[in-house]
Amino acid sequence: MKKITLFFIVISAFTGCKKWLEVQPSDLIVDTELFSNATGFRNSLNGIYIQAARKDLYGKNLSWGLNTAYGQEYMIGKMGAEQALAQDFNKDHASSKLIIDGIWSVAFNNITNCNKLLKEIEGLGEDKFIEGRSERNMIIGEATAMRALMHFELLRLYAPSPAEDVNGKFIPYVNSYPAKFNPPVATSQVIEQIISDLEKAQGLVAENDTLKNRDALAGGLPTMLSGLGYTLPGGSFFTFRMHRLNYVAIHALLARAYLYAGNFAKAKEEARYVYENFGPHGKRPWWKFTEEANTTGANRYTKLANDILFASYDADLLVSLTANFISTYRLSPDVDQWFPVADRDYRAGYISEVQTDIIIQKGKVTEKWNESRSSTAEAKSQNTISPVIRLSEVYYIYSEALFKDGQVNDALTVLNQVRNARGKLTTFNQTGEEAFYQELLTEYRREFLTEGQTFFAYKRLRKNLMRGTQVIPMDSRFTLPIPQQEQIF
């Protein structure tokens, strides 16, 4: 892989609501200065999170941009730069190349930053950190988890699903700094490395998130999302855990990775752990599903944030959405099939018809990305986040793994828990495999609309997509090519 420029974003202050994330990038800093103390490592880790929120990644393409367009969630001709790639499947179009190159380069740049941090922290003892061992381990754990997550996103886009080709060599796994020669390795090896990194990461963040600083998660939505109500002596760096790769989020990502790999037993184990311990049906209900009362009115929760385990933060997200999403992107007419009028579902209340006399702007949109002008901090804080993984996905993973294990009734119970939490009054009770997967995939569409996750369920299962009555086979069109400049290893 060609040399990637190291770019660290520096954060100046750690006091006040989200000050650790709101500061803009500054000049590059000499390594010896940046990594001379614990504050430098905090700065570099914050920069890694900010880079993950860029429009090439979770700020657009890995959420409401390419991934959503690939899932055929937008109307034909009513999307932006993704149209050539996701509608026409033209990977050679100039706009397609910008997307393909952008995701790859920014993701690997972030991986490089993770590896640089991990190399430098080896030389700084735990006594140099304000919160000692737990802080040092937490920083190592989060950087390791981000490295795994970036590789996982690249694998899902730039390689066929493991169900199609697990032995093919498509992307490298880069876990050292500097990285000068990194040939692609088999998908099975990439998955092994991803899982290894996530397993290591969850152990490293465990002390901070479940013992020393547990109230930053147990404190509920205001603390996790808005940083309110709880602060360690170390400062607000230890709050906002929804914006961080926390202990529970990492377990959820492990469940997602195992499921994508086709390892249902391990996916079930990880999902069950989260389900039985941290959700509304668990021993410590630190997360819950947004109550219907919070889905309407001036203080509505636009992103249904109560069950988000990890979300990227971008202070300029609304600016990007206003410039692109609101005036251009319109939902597929198929959305009416996903939310039939006769089947009550409060998620349908987030879909509206654009009121305009301009014909080309007519169509339906999701209000998920609308600006909240609420006076409550936890509602307004949702303006700047892009969900990366939710508790509901853990429920879906657990349900599917139970179904594959022959525990059909238990699988339906778990699936219906999400459906009912979202306002449905009906119970899904069909036990056949085809019917189960049809309902599961429809739930993905309802739950993750424009969040960029639905497409990967179809790719993982090798299920064809639909565009109205048109069948779109799940084939090589949905695997991005490695950028030309990266093909010399």
Protein language model regions, located:
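Membrane-proximal, proline-rich intrinsically disordered regions
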Residues: 17-69, 271, 412, 426, ...
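Conserved, well-structured interaction surfaces
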Residues: 42, 83-158, 180-192, 203-205, ...
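Hydrophobic-face positions in mid-chain alpha helices that act as interaction patches
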Residues: 219-223, 227-230, 237-247, 259-262, ...
